[in-house]
Amino acid sequence: MSELDQLRQEAEQLKSQIREARKSANDTTLATVASNLEPIGRIQMRTRRTLRGHLAKIYAMHWASDSRNLVSASQDGKLIVWDSYTTNKVHAIPLRSSWVMTCAYAPSGSFVACGGLDNICSIYSLKTREGNVRVSRELPGHTGYLSCCRFLDDNQIVTSSGDMTCALWDIETGQQCTAFTGHTGDVMSLSLSPDFRTFISGACDASAKLWDIRDGMCKQTFPGHESDINAVAFFPSGNAFATGSDDATCRLFDIRADQELAMYSHDNIICGITSVAFSKSGRLLFAGYDDFNCNVWDSMRQERAGVLAGHDNRVSCLGVTEDGMAVCTGSWDSFLKIWN
């Protein structure tokens, strides 16, 4: 038996010890605890606004912290900032590369960012003196596509990439401050914790990881999915998070219990999940699917509570406003829809 096989065996034994330790700490299940909760009933939401203007598939969207404006990125090579109340386009930004996969709105509302197959995170300033929008910084350094980016503030942004890493950047200097390494597959998504001290990443190695932004270390790894994780989203309390995967399930993981609490799936749902987001209370989990629908799950009772049907193609992205009053879905049908 080679040394490598011995080490593999040892690693497997350690993994099963961890599984046993998790089991012994698991004194009840979420289903048991949630069984005496009132059912929330059928969630029926209507399309309040349709944002038309993109000419190709929409790949990403992100709400501004004012819960009114949002930014969307499309294969038509445009980044559009919308006013969701009036459906007006506040800015239409032509991109240098049309192969965009992610976009983000800075908490201050002064900047947006995007990136994709160009491997670069581009930062655009919305509040220039001249009134025009321009690239204020380009952040090259990833050796694979940019899959997700989120601002910490106007000078720091976290990115995830197809090069199996995440990174923290100083926007002013354009330098990478921290590299977060440990995934063994493309990192597809990230979600910042409510206190901005940690973030979760989901990757094609079918695991999610919790990272400390300040020291760059991976604090926890969460296995369980059977295929790529495409989307992750923190629970509003910051103590749990949801994942969406190509294995046709969403799952809820508890950070303090260090394990999976719930799985959201249905025999009729056989396609992958592209995006996930929680309602303000965390009771509802919105998930966008390849079959053109957005399912609404009761996160506690693990039941389907509703469906947002209105797109004619894959729902590629979704987001809930900070005030919790609206959901936006973006699709390959080139439209964004606002629901409540």
UniProtKB/Swiss-Prot annotation:
Null allele phenotype: RNAi-mediated knockdown in one-cell embryo results in hyperactive nuclear and spindle movements from early prophase to metaphase characterized by vigorous rocking of nuclear/centrosome complex and its failure to center properly. Normal centrosome alignment during metaphase.
Secretion signal, residue range per the UniProt entry: none
CDD domains, A to Z: WD40
One of the record's GO molecular function terms: signaling receptor complex adaptor activity
InterPro entries reported for this sequence: G-protein_beta_WD-40_rep, Gprotein_B, Guanine_nucleotide-bd_bsu, WD40/YVTN_repeat-like_dom_sf, WD40_repeat_CS, WD40_repeat_dom_sf, WD40_rpt
Disulfide pattern: none
GO biological process, one term: regulation of egg-laying behavior
The entry's keywords: Cell cycle, Cell division, Mitosis, Repeat, Transducer, WD repeat
Spans of repeat WD: 53-83, 95-125, 141-170, 182-212, 224-254, 268-298, 310-340
CC terms in the record's Gene Ontology section: cytoplasm; heterotrimeric G-protein complex
Protein's UniProt keywords contain Cytoplasm: no
A Pfam short name: WD40_Gbeta
Function text: Guanine nucleotide-binding proteins (G proteins) are involved as a modulator or transducer in various transmembrane signaling systems. The beta and gamma chains are required for the GTPase activity, for replacement of GDP by GTP, and for G protein-effector interaction. In the early embryo, controls the magnitude of the forces acting on centrosomes but is not required for generating asymmetric forces.
PANTHER family with a match to the protein in the record: GUANINE NUCLEOTIDE-BINDING PROTEIN BETA G PROTEIN BETA
Quaternary organization: G proteins are composed of 3 units, alpha, beta and gamma. Interacts with G protein gamma subunits gpc-1 and gpc-2 and with egl-10 and eat-16. Interacts with goa-1 (in GDP-bound form).
Similarity field: Belongs to the WD repeat G protein beta family.
Identification of the protein by name: Guanine nucleotide-binding protein subunit beta-1
Organism per entry: Caenorhabditis elegans
